[in-house]
Amino acid sequence: MSQAYDPSQEGAKMSYAKDMSYGDYLHMDALLATHHPQSDAHDEMLFIIQHQTSELWMRLVLHELRAARALLLAGGDFRPAFKMLTRVARIFDQLNSAWDVLRTMTPSDYTTFRNALGNSSGFQSHQYRLIEYMLGNRNTAMMKVHEHRPELHAMLAAELEQPSLYHVALRALAAKTGASFAPEVYRMDNPHSADAAVQAAWRQVYEDPAKYWDLYELGEKLVDLEDYFRRWRFNHVTTVERVIGFKRGTGGTSGVQYLRRMLEVELFPELWHLRGDL
């Protein structure tokens, strides 16, 4: 019979009474103490962890988007920002895979604890709203949901004072191509809508990638990001429809119909529309 493997025989440290351990570094005790089901239903734990892990990934999305925006604002080498935007796209790919786990919960499973949720709903996520605001979909009506938490409301209001990631990209586009955009293009308190001059400038880039390589790659990184973001939204819709059908959402929205409306939002419309012009 073979002996049980003992890592200490190869020099692995096995005592952490006076040193920081894995659990200490990650604050695992605090992290694992955050799950508080409001019912005895077995599947409520799945529901909680699905949403909590999504919020953790969103925390990283915000971290990467802020850094990418700062780098683009500073000008110079865009490549570090490209890495961050690629990471954001991959995070949404990861979040897409997570829907497959939640889909193991059937409508019957969900009904065992749905009433325990009260009026809490995913559209109340301030981190998701920050992501939307940072990407340029600045629907200020959604801030009302956070009026009961002044610190969150202030955080969202502060974001509206900053240029979105796409605003920053458009400034770089104008600077490097010599294009000029109307002031409305840079408005920070409204969702961005397609602009003919912006589309023409992006077309200039895509018709000569070698000349405008940084802008060309930036455009494609933004398209990648929105592509994965759209898939995440679509998977959200199909998962909700699969679990609750066309019932109203717990937060009072129209549920699936509300989510389908979100599928129509274009974050970087000119980058999609120009493809038909090439």
Curated annotation (Swiss-Prot):
Keywords: Dioxygenase, Heme, Iron, Metal-binding, Oxidoreductase, Plasmid, Tryptophan catabolism. Signal peptide: none annotated. Pfam families: Trp_dioxygenase. Heme binds at residue 236. Its cofactor is heme. Substrate binds at residues 47-51, 110, 114, 250. Belongs to the tryptophan 2,3-dioxygenase family. This is Tryptophan 2,3-dioxygenase. The gene is kynA.
